[in-house]
Amino acid sequence: MKFEKDDKKKKVSEDKGTIVEYFYMIPAEVTVRDLVEAVHCVDEEAKEIWTELDLMEIVLSADSLIFENMMDTFTEPGDQEFLAAKGVKVVYAASYNTKDKDMVKKVLEELYAAFGGFMASDTEDLEPIFEIADF
């Protein structure tokens, strides 16, 4: 008995990663210029800022790591209570592709060393909160 080989090639799905978003909560008044100057683990050409948008982009291998000031969106009384209780002065949305997580961790280590703070979930109650070891 002869078995015929299936000539159709099976498609191998490539993991493209997932875009995730957190809030980087910082206990100091920090601008995107401050953020970009604190990051040394990537080439200067990979970093770009838009001061008028208060936005920083770092081009990584799968996608970009983007920090955008979101302080003006935390206007609800519950938000204000959370920020005050945690001593947060500025909030940046941080979005990145999960395929870049190792480099994102290096960037976050540099930012945490320079400014402190923590990452909060993009959820209604901002929980859970993540420390650098969680990345």
Language model features with spans:
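Short, intrinsically disordered low-complexity segments
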Residues: 12, 26-99
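Acidic, proline/glycine-rich low-complexity IDRs
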Residues: 1-22, 30-49, 95, 102-135
